[in-house]
């Protein structure tokens, strides 16, 4: 997911998306630990998605404080 796509979404949608990605990240970590995860690159993609979402949310919080 691109940061430009995330910036178009509402804050509530971003928070829900963050929750979903965190759940997915947890499930992938459990699969990796049990040896069931075949595509380990998925873990990195989800981690970067979480970082992008958090970045956009923090940008909005900073903008609110400055306004």
From Swiss-Prot:
GO terms for cellular component: cytosolic large ribosomal subunit. GO terms for biological process: translation. GO terms for molecular function: structural constituent of ribosome. InterPro entries: Ribosomal_protein_uL29 (IPR050063), Ribosomal_uL29 (IPR001854), Ribosomal_uL29_sf (IPR036049). It holds the Pfam family Ribosomal_L29. Keywords: Ribonucleoprotein, Ribosomal protein. It comes from the Bacteria. Belongs to the universal ribosomal protein uL29 family. This is Large ribosomal subunit protein uL29. The gene is rpmC.
């Amino acid at each position: 997911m691109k940061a430009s796509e995330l910036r178009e979404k509402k804050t509530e949608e971003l928070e829900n998306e963050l929750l979903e990605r965190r759940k997915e990240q947890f499930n992938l970590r459990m699969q990796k630990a049990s040896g069931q995860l075949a595509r380990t690159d998925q873990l990195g993609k989800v981690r970067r998605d979480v970082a992008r979402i958090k970045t956009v949310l923090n940008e909005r919080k900073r903008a609110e404080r400055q306004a």
